[in-house]
């Protein structure tokens, strides 16, 4: 059944106390009837409990039109949480949301996934990786594996007549040193507000039962830049992003010597009618105005996904 194109929807956001879930809840509440579901009590959690509470989940999803499923364990948990717990939360939890959604007659699930699941495929030897929906993931961690498994079960259910699904593989979206975050915004980072807008667009996207999109900041780079990005990133930045080069020079920051991957959101731009609006200049503005989203500069190094 297609989603309504204009009337307000009843939407449940899981993981609504988290960074991304909260941003999505706040954005959607401007035009829809939104309730949040999370283990942590907060202003955006109308239902407080765990996804393994089937009765609570059923009540939360009663008469819902759509579910946005953000609740998950993430990369920082890998060193601290057993693999079995990852599967319990990321795979079994997604299955419980799917089952409750199907029972409630939910028509659309938007699943918040991650570009991290591409694993080693994102960083080939000798070149920056060009990462889009056509690239086959090579998962490395339990986080990668469980997000892929959750995607697969949602996609299979949609293909068999269950709720339609839109899978959004989002890039880095958390506080980092300003010089790192600003550079990443060109090729592997995104603002939480742009993530929220992508979810809003995915709610009403027509088309197949299941579709997957890479969600990342707008990139000035082209696929043909990948070899040079790997070995001579400053020269490519001079050509493709002179405003960032000038801003870094003014602040005395070094440019990255190597860029190892580029996430391309082109399919989402074309299909969803979505446009990321908060690029590197917004990162600098947030830093200059002491917004705690952005940390002080470091030497330019950053942890991997």
Regions found by a protein language model. Name each.
Residues 197-260, 265, 270-271, 294-299:
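Mid/C-terminal beta-alpha module of Rossmann-like enzyme folds, strongest
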